[in-house]
């Protein structure tokens, strides 16, 4: 299935939408979790890829989602994939009824369907060895004189200073790394929930039509999405964890009673033992409060002194947790039911040529002001024009296919859940007829 197929299945029938699906060039990066020097199992490489999705309706952006995918290679036969959900946001400027929860879930399903090898074909190395690249290429190590000689040679040979063969395999192997891994690998999804008036659409909270969730509502909203993914996309022995820093475990378990998946537990998917050091267990994600606290511990020279149990206690005392709102850490860890096999096409993702260009395109969404509808319109217009004029491509269009069912419309008999029937409240006793 293409991204178009995934999205159209949850968008209202006959309604027209456009979508932006940005993907960064996969980058070799540091390990997600700092390895202990005593660990016998140390990652060989970690590849990070950023996804940014936006949906448009009637010439206005109304939804965006930011996700990072990490593929950790332990060796040629062992790897794992970690999907970090960074931010999701709406601005209230959609003129038709849509389920943002279902849109978010279906995009995560799309990411889960991607073969992890897709991210490993063309990886920008953390450090490039310029001494080993072809002398025909201009690099950061090229002197001005050498650069001029290369440009003059290109101009003489092809009439242009642009190297048209830059995408050929002989040059790509000089510039990028490539790896392989099994398709069936351990998959983790994790996220941090903390309520805010806006995440990706500045000033959108000033729009009275925007629906803003409080901490408990937001946690339940994401919990529903992960719970559905567990049931529909993961094997039945998958781990599922919820941690609310500073909250009593009994209270956390009360939230888990509403989950359909039976193996939810209190805790997080990264903790092995509570008395082990936090630095060797806490993941380092972009713009994440847990990672910020780890960096603070490094500045205070306390990395080798704070255990996991102390980490969670101290974390709740930080300013971003002291607002009397519910914040949580959620995660699942297991194997997919279906083997990921999708290699996204150019219709599924747009891959800018550099991180700078990726950020510039994303900025057209996140840099607008959404206190009025004009911001949503400007974002759509700027994205559309940039893609057309600078990248010779377009936003992808789709037509929704989901039929809307009124609340009082009966569910077809074939789809009725018999378990739900047995759980209906008992019928009240009929009042006795008056005696005559």
Curated annotation (Swiss-Prot):
What is known about its induction?
Answer: Expression peaks in cell cycle G1.
Q: What are its E.C. numbers?
A: 2.3.1.48
The effect of pH on activity is described as: Optimum pH is >8.5.
InterPro entries per UniProt? HAT_RTT109-like, Histone_AcTrfase_Rtt109/CBP, Rtt109
Which parts of the sequence belong to the Rtt109-type HAT domain? 2-404
| Reactions it catalyzes | L-lysyl-[histone] + acetyl-CoA = N(6)-acetyl-L-lysyl-[histone] + CoA + H(+); L-lysyl-[protein] + acetyl-CoA = N(6)-acetyl-L-lysyl-[protein] + CoA + H(+)
Subcellular location per UniProt equals:
Nucleus
Report the outcome of residue 290 to A.
Abolishes histone acetylase activity. Increases sensitivity to methyl methane sulfonate, camptothecin and hydroxyurea (genotoxic stress)
Other remarks in the entry: Present with 1140 molecules/cell in log phase SD medium.
Quaternary structure and partners: Forms a complex composed of two RTT109 subunits and one VPS75 homodimer; each RTT109 subunit interacts predominantly with VPS75 instead of interacting with the other RTT109 subunit. Interacts with VPS75; the interaction is direct. Interacts (via C-terminus) with ASF1; the interaction is direct. Interacts with histone H3/H4 heterodimers via histone H3.
Q: What is this protein called?
A: Histone acetyltransferase RTT109
Q: Tell me which species this is from.
A: Saccharomyces cerevisiae (strain ATCC 204508 / S288c) (Baker's yeast)
Q: What is the lineage of its organism?
A: Eukaryota, Fungi, Dikarya, Ascomycota, Saccharomycotina
The encoding gene: RTT109
